[in-house]
């Protein structure tokens, strides 16, 4: 029997194009992406967690949604359905493309040398790239749904679709990535 995400989408055909993210993006076939924190005991175990669950966890990160995992998984499932209807592609593949396009490759860090602090450009680890991408996608969806007729699921679907196309005008996550990389480039 073939296991599909939410009983609908096959994750066997999903490919990660970015070689640095391959070992950190988990698209292992699961029926319901809910591990109940099993992968939070060790440092890099979150890379074993399914990306759909990590997205749901990031959506739960604000005050009014804390702990409402079932509601958040329903929102993510609805968003994936909307993505499938609009793009006619596997929504998990669209999510992977969005993560690749919205994770910054370099950032700045603050270095103090002789009492003078300045910014220094540094490369970003693949794990941090993914964390930043998840955070920006979730933040962009929740901000665009605030005081809007659209539901959070519709806004999340829009954000993922625009991020997968690397649309800087419409995607909050891609805009934030470009902003961080621009600041890092000026700090070289």
From Swiss-Prot:
Residue intervals passing through the bilayer: none
Biological process per Gene Ontology, one example term: translation
Pfam families: Ribosomal_S7 (PF00177)
Keyword rRNA-binding among record annotations: yes
One Gene Ontology MF term: structural constituent of ribosome
Source organism superkingdom: Archaea
Gene3D superfamilies: Ribosomal protein S7 domain (1.10.455.10)
Keyword hit for Chaperone: no
Keywords, comma-separated and alphabetical: Ribonucleoprotein, Ribosomal protein, RNA-binding, rRNA-binding
A GO cellular component entry from the record: small ribosomal subunit
SUPFAM superfamilies in UniProt: Ribosomal protein S7
InterPro entries to which the protein is assigned, alphabetical: Ribosomal_uS7, Ribosomal_uS7_arc, Ribosomal_uS7_CS, Ribosomal_uS7_dom, Ribosomal_uS7_dom_sf, Ribosomal_uS7_euk/arc
HAMAP family assigned: Ribosomal_uS7_A
Role of this protein: One of the primary rRNA binding proteins, it binds directly to 16S rRNA where it nucleates assembly of the head domain of the 30S subunit. Is located at the subunit interface close to the decoding center.
Similarity remark: Belongs to the universal ribosomal protein uS7 family.
PANTHER family assigned to the protein according to its UniProt record, in alphabetical order: RIBOSOMAL PROTEIN S7
Assembly and interaction partners: Part of the 30S ribosomal subunit.
Stated name of the protein: Small ribosomal subunit protein uS7
Gene from which this protein is expressed: rps7
